[in-house]
Amino acid sequence: MLRNMVESRKTSETDIRLDLNLRGSGVYAFDTEIPFFEHMLSHIAKHGLIDMDLKLRGDIGIDCHHSVEDTAILLGQMIHTQLGDKKGIFRYGNFTLPMDEVLTTVAVDLGGRFYFKYTGPALDGKFGIYDAELTLEFLQKLALNAKMNLHVVVHYGENRHHIHESIFKALGKALRQAIAIDTSAKDQIPSTKGMLE
């Protein structure tokens, strides 16, 4: 497993540079011009013990869609690459997180197959310039490019900010479990097939 990676993604719509360490301590720095997005990413980093340094410029004069989507694509690709053959990792992670009146569960499988499912209240409205519906776009593209199963269930809750924050915090916690090394099987691929994509 690689410890540090620095990758870039540049299109006619976005210019992104991401420094990522899955075996970090939760240190992060963001420069995206989208404050709410940075706030959500900080929860993945902090609770996943993932170091992230993200610089992003996008066509936010139109909206934030391309910026959020392309960040998810790059982050997902880097997670998949950094995990390598996935030898020794737990592979699975799940976390149920309470945040005041909200209760959210996130479950992941880093087994190499994409699936995304969200169950919960509609994510709509805006947080500054960030459209709330972009959270689902981010999660779907992250799962697709990391080649993982990602299930998100918001069991109940009302406050829109709490709902979003609980999703990203629980995602960080679930990823932390899944990428952790299983010391009882550190030289084994966590699959009866003997390999994972």
Curated annotation (Swiss-Prot):
Signal peptide: none annotated. It is an enzyme of class 4 (lyase). Its main location: cytoplasm. Keywords: Amino-acid biosynthesis, Cytoplasm, Histidine biosynthesis, Lyase. It catalyses: D-erythro-1-(imidazol-4-yl)glycerol 3-phosphate = 3-(imidazol-4-yl)-2-oxopropyl phosphate + H2O. The keyword Transport does not apply. NCBIfam families: PRK00951.2-4. This is Imidazoleglycerol-phosphate dehydratase. The gene is hisB.
